[in-house]
From Swiss-Prot:
GO terms for molecular function: phosphatidylinositol binding. Keywords: Coiled coil, Phosphoprotein. Transmembrane segments: none annotated. Residues 445-462 have a biased composition (Low complexity). InterPro entries: PX_dom (IPR001683), PX_dom_sf (IPR036871), Run_dom (IPR004012), Run_dom_sf (IPR037213), RUN_SNX29 (IPR047329), SNX29_PX (IPR037916). The modification Phosphothreonine is found at T644. This is Sorting nexin-29. Belongs to the sorting nexin family. CDD domains: PX_RUN, RUN_SNX29. Residues 36-180 form the RUN domain. Disulfide bonds: none annotated. The modification Phosphoserine is found at S268, S291, S292, S330, S344, S447, S452, S642, S645, S649.
């Protein structure tokens, strides 16, 4: 494989594994439900981990030959494991006790099974992440077991394995690790033909049991799935197993009569018959089979394939013959499987049945007898009738009366597609379609001693001979797993499609945004081009004016050349130093040069003006920003500095005559209890190096506002926060009111500075307190005055006043408190 194909394969494995992990997390993540191997998502997850760990394993020919020799010497006839398995590398990182644990499993006999058991055990114990870190840590050891193009050798992708394993720790796994199904081939891509071929290896061991074991086995088959054992498929294609969804066990089967039992002969087939061809004969069990200890007589066990419904006998003991009918179809467009009934019948009924089913032929009992037809119940549905073939009766001994019925014809003798469509569309149809006669006949096979040809009983070498119930279950489970994998793959493809559609929608939105951006740029460029075109037109007009002036000068020079020359009074001819035409030409050329220079200077002035304009705009923005920062940091200044003045000279005058008076309201305190609680605002005033604090309520601010309104009508234009009766204790509201009161006090201070020039020239605390008593700093009794004179009075808020002499200058409030 090429490098691109290997990379595509690794990416495919990664996407499948990510999808399997995602499906398990969606289904079981964060829940208390246990994830067992009966769920297809868990099976798919294990299969994907196996595929990743199996990818790129190096083949060791010597080890494979050694293992094959050992198995051949031990007498195993199963196929030798030639494919390398990841267990050979996993066991390198396991300790002695862990190895002993997996080698001591009863049903695990192969390295592939141990690897799968280890994987499921790691998922159960949430130790897969730790094991994966150990497996991927040693790169040198990895290179000895894996190819360079394998998945685990890809550092970028293999590094995601522990992360995915860690994501599974939230799921409670309960997977069976000691399961003989783990010994088989890989379960992520099974085929029915492989499972059927492997099933022939266990036929002999399953059929070679005692009479009681056979009876119990038949009863177990009846109670679980009631599936007939295929002996000879007539077609070469892999037969599709058909298993009923519901099992109907007749209550008469449970009332087994224990008076006497008939000896049951079991026909067994060795594994060699697949290789020997059709010339060999069937092997049979000895006719002297063990009978029950408590019963001396013999009973027969008949395995009959039948559809769901009651098979009632007539009054004389024989079963009535009726036609097989198709009366209903399955729901939701899915054909159902018919139910089978395996019954153990007494010897008295068996004698009547033997008369009806058999006729003597020579030494053996071979012949044909038509089986009684059964009418299909109205609630049953027919699906793939070709899966149930005519049954064949095998006789093991001439003396034995035990008959076992097996299906003879292969799959496909009567297909579901052959049935009329009208009978399958609903369950209440009135049409009855009869199954062809050859599909309902039973044949009796003579014993091998009678020279019956093997070709009439055995299939070709390429088709499996028989299947046990467990193998049929395994085949169905494999097909269901494959179906789940295909559905999950379809879901992942749909998810990828949805992702691509979302990506495409995002790209469309991005393209639309780019188109809008390009359109805006084109509009801006068009506007700029129009402005340049207008400027060009203006320049053209100016140039025309300049050219007209130059032409006018030229015309004036030409008229000057027509003036006659001057003569002296003495009639002497005076030779002028220079002709007037030449003077006019020089004058015109000088004017032209001057005009050109003026035009150049005009262009330079325009460009210089544009530069000055841009610089002025930038400076104005910077000055406005710095002015706002100055107001925030240093407080108000004389004049309304917060408002941008168009008169630059006025602003310069205000800045040069600035009085150092600053006002802040840095904080608010809540005083009182319960319903009597109120807020107190801290007012901080600084005049040059003198600073003090005043604590006032909102009512005092409001009283000050009313006093100033009566004295100065201009104060009405100032923004004062209104009174609010409900919600005035909210922190956000109090903060907003603090900012508004601070702005109001600064406006009042600016007004005082403008109205009282003496105070602006020499600002002092005493002067401000006389002008505005609102700023009086009231000290509690007994407190000594500091350097600045303060009147002695009782403080209205003793807990907020200073309890010790204040320093000359306190720390200035931070900008964050403003």
């Amino acid at each position: 494989m090429s490098g691109s194909q290997n990379d595509d394969r690794r990416q495919f494995l990664l996407e499948r594994l990510l999808d399997a992990v995602k499906q398990c997390q969606i289904r079981f993540g964060g829940r208390k439900e246990i994830a067992s191997d009966s769920d297809s998502r868990v099976t798919c997850l294990c299969a994907q981990f196996e595929a990743v760990l199996q990818h790129g394993m190096k083949r060791s020919r010597g080890l494979a030959l050694t293992a094959a020799a050992i198995k051949q010497a031990a007498g195993f006839t199963s196929k030798t494991e030639t494919e390398p398995v990841f267990w050979v590398y996993v066991k390198e990182v396991l300790n002695k006790h862990e190895l002993q644990r997996f080698y001591s499993l009863h049903h695990i006999t192969s390295d592939a099974g141990r690897g799968r058991a280890w994987l499921r055990c790691a998922l159960n114990e949430h130790s897969l992440e730790r094991y994966l870190h150990m497996l991927l840590a040693d790169r040198a050891r990895l290179s000895t077991f894996y190819e360079d193009w394998s998945f685990v050798m890809d550092e970028e992708r293999s590094s995601m394995l522990p992360t995915m394993a860690a994501g599974l720790n939230s799921i409670l796994f309960a997977i069976n690790i000691d399961n003989k199904d783990l010994n088989g081939q890989s379960k992520f891509a099974p085929t029915v033909s492989d499972l059927l071929k492997e099933s022939t290896q266990n036929v002999t061991s399953l059929l070679k049991e005692s009479t009681q074991g056979m009876s119990s086995l038949l009863r177990e088959i009846t109670a679980s799935s009631a599936v007939s054992i295929l002996i000879k498929p007539e077609q070469e294609t892999d037969p599709l197993p058909v298993i009923s969804k519901n099992v109907h066990v007749d209550t008469r089967c449970k009332r087994e009569r224990r008076r006497r039992k008939k000896v049951t002969n079991i026909v067994s087939f060795d594994d060699d018959e697949e290789e020997q061809g059709t010339g060999d004969t069937l092997k049979k069990m000895p006719g002297t089979a063990e009978s029950s200890e408590e019963n001396s007589d013999r009973s027969s066990v008949n395995i009959m394939a039948a559809f769901e419904g009651t098979f009632g006998p007539n009054s004389n003991g024989s079963q009535s013959s009726s036609s097989w009918k198709i009366d209903s179809a399955s729901l939701n467009g899915e054909l159902g499987y018919q139910k089978l009934d395996v019954k153990s019948i007494d010897d008295d009924v068996d004698e009547n049945e033997e008369d009806a089913y058999r006729s003597p032929l020579g030494r053996g009992h071979t012949g044909h007898a038509e089986s009684p037809d059964r009418t299909l119940d109205g609630n049953a549905c027919l699906a793939q009738v070709h899966g149930w073939a005519p049954l064949q009766v095998l006789h093991g001994d001439a003396d034995a009366d035990t008959d076992v019925l097996f299906p003879v014809s292969g799959v496909g003798s009567y297909g579901a597609a052959d049935a009329p469509v009208g009978s399958l569309e609903n369950g209440t149809g009135t049409e009855n379609h009869i199954i062809p006669e050859p599909g309902l006949r039973y044949r009796e096979a003579s014993s091998p001693g009678q020279g019956s040809p093997l070709s009439s009983l055995l299939p070709s070498a390429s088709v499996p001979e028989s299947m046990t119930v467990h193998e049929l279950r395994q085949a169905i489970v494999a097909m269901m797993n494959r179906k789940d994998e295909l559905e999950e793959e379809n879901g992942s493809l749909r998810n990828l499609l949805d992702g691509e559609m979302e990506h495409s929608a995002a790209l469309r939105q991005e393209v639309d945004a780019l188109r809008r951006k390009v359109t805006e740029q084109q509009e801006r460029h068009a506007t700029k081009v129009q402005a340049l075109a207008r400027e060009n037109e203006v320049l053209k007009v100016q140039l025309k004016k300049y050219v007209g002036a130059v032409q006018m000068l030229k015309r004036e020079g030409q008229t000057a050349e027509a003036v006659p020359s001057l003569w002296n009074v003495d009639a002497e001819v005076t030779v002028p130093e220079q002709k007037p035409g030449e003077v006019a030409e020089e004058l015109a050329s000088s004017y032209e040069r001057k005009l050109i220079e003026v035009a150049e200077m005009h262009g330079e002035l325009i460009e210089f003006n544009e530069r000055l304009h841009r610089a002025l705009v930038a400076k104005e923005a910077l000055v406005s920003q710095m002015r706002q920062e100055l107001i925030d940091l240093r407080g108000p200044v004389p004049g309304d500095l917060s408002q941008t003045s168009e008169d630059q000279s006025l602003s310069d005058f205000e800045i040069s005559n600035r009085a150092l008076i600053n006002v802040w309201i840095p904080s608010v305190f809540l005083r009182g209890k319960a319903a009597n609680a109120f807020h107190v605002y801290q007012v901080y005033i600084r005049i040059k190096d003198d600073e003090w604090n005043v604590y006032r309520r909102y009512t005092e601010f409001r009283a000050l506002h009313h006093q100033l309104q009566s004295a100065f009508p201009q104060v009405r234009a100032y923004s004062f926060p209104p009174k609010k009766a409900i919600g005035n204790k909210d922190a956000k509201f109090v903060e907003e009111r603090r900012k508004q009161l601070q702005s109001y006090l600064r406006s009042v201070m600016n007004k005082v500075i403008q109205m009282v020039p003496e105070f602006a020239a020499n600002p002092k605390k005493e002067t401000l307190v006389q002008l505005v008593p609102f700023f009086v700093d009231i000290t509690p009794p007994g407190e000594p005055l500091n350097k600045s004179s303060r009147p002695k009075a009782v403080s209205r808020f003793p807990k907020l006043s200073r309890g010790h002499p204040r320093e000359v200058r306190n720390v200035e409030p931070q900008s964050g408190d403003l």
